[in-house]
C-alpha cells in the first residue's frame, strides 16, 4: 500500500525545509507518496487561500500544514479550511502555537509544536539573505542533533502505519520540549546529552529575544544588537549540538534510524553494523 501524504508549507520555520525529506531520506521509500504545495516566504490569508485548496483538490490520506505561529491570521485561516475538509490534518508550528493548541484540538486537528524552532531576527538593518540562510542552517543543526527531528519523523511514521493498517491516522498532540527531543536523540554519553539539552534550551530562548527585538523595541540602536545577539545565541547552540554528536561519534554510539526497504523505521548504533 502507498500512503498519500500532502504537505502545505506557508512561510518558513526551521523544520519546513526538511519536513518531507525526513520521511524519505534516500528518495527510495516505496510505501509513501508525498506532494508538497507552498506559498514561499509569505503566509498571509490570501496566500493560504490559494495553497490550501490546491492541496485539498488532491487525493491524500492525510495533510500536514507547517508554518510559523499557528495563531497568526494566515495559519488560522488554514486551520479553518483544514478543519472543514474531509481529510485528517495536522499542524506543525513553533512555540507561539502553544497559545492555540487547545483551539487546534477543538478544530479536530493534530499538532506538533517544536519549542526550539525559533523566530528569526527579521529586522531589515540586520537580516539579509545570507544571514537568513545562516540562521536556518543553525536551526537545522540544533533540531537534528538534539533529537527534535526524530520526534517529528516518528510521529508522522506512526500516522503512516495507521493508514497502512486500514485505520484513520491518530492525530498527534505533541509538544517537543527539551526532554522529549533529547530522549529521541538516544545519547549514550551523559556529557553529550548535557550539551544537547543546553543547545535545545538556548534555541528555545532565541525566539523570546527576537520577539523583543522585532516587535517590542523601536529604537534601531537598541533592536539591531538585540536581534544580532539572538543569532549569536543560536550559533552557540548549534556548536553545542555538533559537540554532542561528536562525542557520540568518538564512542561509536550515534543512533541512526533509517527507513528500510519496505518503509519501516530501522535502528542502529555501531557505524559498521546493518540497521535492524
UniProtKB/Swiss-Prot annotation:
Region annotated Disordered, chain positions: 253-276
Pathway named in the protein's UniProt entry: One-carbon metabolism; methanogenesis from CO(2); 5,10-methylene-5,6,7,8-tetrahydromethanopterin from 5,10-methenyl-5,6,7,8-tetrahydromethanopterin (coenzyme F420 route): step 1/1
pH dependency: Optimum pH is 6.0. Optimum pH is 4.0.
InterPro entries: MTD, MTD_sf
Induction summary: Enzyme activity is not detectable when grown anaerobically.
Residues annotated as transmembrane: none
Lineage: Archaea, Methanobacteriati, Methanobacteriota, Methanomada group, Methanobacteria
This protein's encoding gene: mtd
Protein name (database record): F420-dependent methylenetetrahydromethanopterin dehydrogenase
Biased amino acid composition, Basic and acidic residues: 259-276
Modulation of this protein's activity: Activity requires salt; 100 mM sodium or potassium salts of chloride, phosphate or sulfate are equally effective. Not inactivated by O(2). Inhibited by hydrogen-producing 5,10-methenyltetrahydromethanopterin hydrogenase which has a higher affinity for their shared substrate. Enzyme is O(2)-stable and strictly dependent on coenzyme F420.
